[in-house]
Amino acid sequence: MIGNKTVVYTSGTFDMLHYNHLKMLEYARALGDILIVGVNTDELVASYKSQPIIPFEERIGLMKAIKGPDIVIPQKSLDHTDKIKKLHFDIFVVGDDWVGKYDYLEKLGICVV
């Protein structure tokens, strides 16, 4: 929380940005006052799947250009523990393909949806 504002954080590759990405961002936006979006770097993506089709600089540029996110940052790690300390987020939104992988954040007081 920043002041009395609820901070929502989500992250993803956002390669080939599509309708479901936008719906997820719209959902995340509705959960709080400030939406921060982390865009996975090419190096991070390469650690768990094949390289993205769209390069990182273009993906982060697309995310900055759309309505919804208040802040867009590079996501360099799948571990979000340091991000909690820096960004003070209250809610972490995960896509369907990541459900269950961030439950450890709940032990740190973060609502994972």
Which residues make up each language-model segment?
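Nucleotidyltransferase catalytic core that binds NTPs
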Residues: 1-113
